[in-house]
Structures are given as C-alpha cells and as structure tokens.
C-alpha cells in the first residue's frame, strides 16, 4: 500500500533509530499488501517517546488519518512491556493477529495473565452496558443513530467474546458468527440477535424500519 510505505518512510526520516516497530493489528493484519486500502490499525513503538516526537510526527499521522485510517497507537518500548496487565484483551488480539511492517517483532514477549484478561472482560462488559443505556436514551428516536450504536456494541462484544474464548483455552474462530456461537458455550447470550447484529455491521443484512429501536 502506497500510503503505508510513504508513512513508514516519513517516520524513519523523522524518528531515525528511535523508531523500533511499526505493526498492523486487527482484521487487516492478514490482508495481502496490495489489497490494503484504508481502515488500517497501526501500532508505532519508539525506543523513547517525548512530546517532541508527538509534535514532529503529528503532520504525517494526520495525513494518515485523513486517508480513512484510525489514529495509530503510539507508545514507548517501556510502555509496551508494562501494559500487558492493563490491556490484556488488546494484547491477546495482537498476539494472535498482527503483521510487522517495519522493525523489531516484540510480540514474542507478550505474556497475558488470565487473571487480568478475565478482569478486563468483566470491566468492558459492564462499561458497555452503561454506555449503551445512555446512548439508547439519547438516540432512540433515530434509526440511523441507533444503528451506529448497535454496530459499536457488537464490535466491542466481539472483542470481549474473543477474550472469553481464550480464557477457556480454545482457538478463536475467524468469522463473527462462529465467535458468537463459540462464546455461547461459556455465556448466556442471544446468539440469533447477536449474529444478526454482526451481519448488519458487516453489510450482509439490513435492519427493518424501527427494528433497531426495540
């Protein structure tokens, strides 16, 4: 992908030897390079991270975001190694699905304690319920806004479900449908509803008029 190659070249020029790693994580990590177009999650790891580094890279990263990509995660090497407990869900996902596009591969050192993974699953689920209730109150009269809320809900639930599956030492399926079905072995969830929500988010189905408000 030209945009990605250009970004890496710019980061190398700006950061020099301070740039340790650039990696793709998430759903795009296993996509062939020529098919990468947008919505690419990047993690940028530096040996040391200062306010000057943020300032100096802001312009090229803003350009990257304007090309319809999420804001990259940027951190120091020390932060990377000290965050396995706080971001247990995220590191579990990264370890399973990533691609190094520049520099060192630090993922072999990822060690996620199941205690912290369980705690984050519980915390994220409770926070999701609270946020959803608030959004429901504020967006209930708009099908379009409620669909956005539902898409965000299922996106977060799938992350949590992957964590739950890993807690039980099972492999995480690729498709949203099978992730939901696998998680249902360990949780009481409405698989039919959740699969429908996932299909709508993935563009496979559409909600009927006012269905999203129920």
Which positions does each model-derived feature cover?
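Metal-dependent nucleotidyltransferase catalytic core
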Residues: 1-14, 30-37, 42-87
């Amino acid at each position: 992908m030209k945009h990605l190659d250009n970004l890496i070249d710019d980061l190398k020029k700006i950061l020099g030897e301070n740039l340790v790693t650039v990696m793709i994580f998430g759903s795009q990590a296993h996509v062939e390079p020529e098919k990468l177009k947008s919505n690419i999650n990047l993690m940028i790891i530096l040996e040391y991270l200062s306010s000057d580094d943020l300032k100096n890279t802001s312009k090229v990263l803003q350009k990257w975001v304007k090309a319809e990509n999420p804001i990259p995660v940027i951190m120091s090497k020390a932060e990377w190694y000290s965050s396995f407990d706080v971001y247990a869900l995220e590191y579990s996902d990264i370890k399973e699905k990533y691609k190094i596009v520049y520099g060192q591969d630090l993922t072999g050192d990822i060690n996620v304690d199941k205690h912290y993974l369980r705690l984050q699953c519980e915390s994220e689920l409770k926070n999701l319920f609270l946020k959803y209730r608030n959004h429901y109150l504020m967006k209930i009269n708009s099908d379009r806004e409620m669909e956005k809320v539902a898409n965000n809900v299922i996106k977060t639930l799938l992350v949590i479900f992957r964590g739950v599956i890993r807690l039980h030492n099972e492999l995480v399926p690729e498709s949203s449908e099978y992730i939901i079905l696998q998680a249902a072995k360990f949780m009481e969830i409405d698989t039919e509803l959740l699969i429908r929500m996932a299909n709508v988010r993935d563009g496979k189905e559409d909600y009927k008029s006012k269905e999203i408000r129920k």
